Amino acid sequence: MLPFSQQYSEETLIRIQQELDLNCPSPESNLVKLGRCVATLPGSEEAAKLRRLVMDIDDFTAQIRWHLGQALLLMDSQPDILKAGEDDDDIIKGLGMPAGAQLLLRGYIRDADRVLYDDLSTSRLGGTVGGWIFHMMIDSAVYRAVSVLDRLATVLWYAAELPMERIYFRSGKVKKLHTAFCSDETAHLLRIAEGKLLNFIIDYRDGLTHSTKAYSRASGFTPLEQWKDENGRLVIWDENAWDAEMLFALGRASYLQFTEALGPSVSICEKKWPIQP
């Protein structure tokens, strides 16, 4: 069972939608304005790419809110997600489960390769199916939030008429945009790009994409590694497991970084491509 196939009552869906709207409000008016800026640009390859970028931004915004909405539904319907790890042994709670042990026992775990379930409270590798899906929802929301910021930076790159290159919403690229526009809007965008919060979010996304994913207790045991260095000192590699509240906070923060950047970006686009009456 996936969270979106569960039979939630209309009352529950309305309540969770209200909670989503409160915590992750839709930037509807800015999305409409951004679309109108590029909708009637004369036909050209650049205009076509701009319109596709803006359509991507629109759809990704809805996708992020969908994932965060599903996460809220899971926290509401599966309270074990919020309580995960409370009853753990102190050693497991403090350090995690040795990764070597998890890998050695992998072949002996009952139904270890099962990925489809009809009960979200089913145990799975030390967590629950609901917790496993919950973490995936947050990871997907974070991934999309960084992706939509990169597309937003590309739209602004076209507006600045800068030579095309690989564009990302990072401080180096946004500095070039600020040099081109030298505006209050790009100064705001630069503060976002240079901020500790966005860089933390990007580091999380990069770990997920390229190196080591984060773990949460709700989705299973956190892997523990330890060894001795060249000086004989014990080294313990143990990343603290994320709890559900902090994971949702990460997803929400990622989304709100995008919506904060969207407002000044739309202002820039309205000046570059005035909305036609």
PLM regions and their residue ranges:
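Acidic, Ser/Thr/Gly/Pro-rich intrinsically disordered interaction regions
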Residues: 1-139, 143, 154-277
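Short, positively charged
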Residues: 148
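Extracellular acidic loop/turn motifs
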Residues: 151
